């Protein structure tokens, strides 16, 4: 029995040490109020105050767009004291967002405004990213059914 334990500890000692990554680092979400689906889309949702229900804010291609949609919704639900992902960006849009109207705004209108901002950010990010179709030159394939001319050989 002791010999088995010694062999087990010897095997453990022979293995090279592995770097340990804390669980909270590996599973940390990039932004508040969003999550990633298995197929890669990012979704945003928020809990309504004093309710168990969640307010669906939409599905987006980028995490930034989902986070911006969340920021708009949380601002409308909780006011200027809300914890935001991008507080500087919301301050730039302050003329569009009025904290005075947040208290009685219906959930459908909050969802609509958040989805509008998220879609706008998604579109901006998609247009800013260079498209693979535009950056690669077209490939000209030769017709293999024709006999090559002497200059082509």
From Swiss-Prot:
The lineage of its organism: Eukaryota, Viridiplantae, Streptophyta, Embryophyta, Tracheophyta. CDD domains: AP2. Residues 1-29 are annotated as: Disordered. Transmembrane segments: none annotated. Belongs to the AP2/ERF transcription factor family. ERF subfamily. GO terms for molecular function: DNA binding; DNA-binding transcription factor activity. Residues 30-87 bind DNA. It comes from Arabidopsis thaliana (Mouse-ear cress). Keywords: Activator, DNA-binding, Ethylene signaling pathway, Nucleus, Transcription, Transcription regulation. It is found in: Nucleus. It comes from the Eukaryota. PROSITE patterns: AP2_ERF. This is Ethylene-responsive transcription factor RAP2-1. GO terms for cellular component: nucleus. It holds the Pfam family AP2. Expressed at low levels in flowers, leaves, and stems, and at very low levels in roots.
